[in-house]
């Protein structure tokens, strides 16, 4: 049914797992560059995302539509050493 994501408490102190990161980031060659992350995340976007669009599927696939002048660090580096694929 209608879940609503209220993130009033997680804005100031975001947990380490939800810190912003991006594996697929593309920037324009303009100055300053305009960078967008095309990562698909399940059920939510990263903590710094202002414009998050999710599909209505289960689980929801979410993409952040923000345009920044930088890319966040890659998410893959946060996994443990046993996760090498």
Curated annotation (Swiss-Prot):
Compositional bias (Low complexity): 8-18
Site (Reactive bond for trypsin): 29-30
Pfam families in alphabetical order: Bowman-Birk_leg (PF00228)
The keyword Transferase is assigned to this record: no
Alphabetized GO MF terms: serine-type endopeptidase inhibitor activity
Bridged cysteine pairs (disulfide): 21-75, 22-37, 25-71, 27-35, 45-52, 49-64, 54-62
UniProt record similarity statement: Belongs to the Bowman-Birk serine protease inhibitor family.
Protein name listed in UniProt: Bowman-Birk type proteinase inhibitor PVI-3(2)
């Amino acid at each position: 049914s209608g879940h609503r994501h209220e993130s009033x408490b997680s804005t100031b102190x975001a947990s380490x797992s939800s810190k912003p990161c991006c594996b697929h980031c593309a920037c324009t060659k303009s100055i300053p560059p305009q960078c967008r992350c095309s990562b698909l995340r399940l059920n939510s976007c990263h903590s710094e995302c202002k414009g998050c669009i999710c599909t209505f599927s289960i689980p929801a696939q979410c993409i952040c539509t923000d345009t920044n002048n930088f890319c966040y660090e890659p998410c893959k580096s946060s996994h443990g050493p046993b996760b090498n694929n």
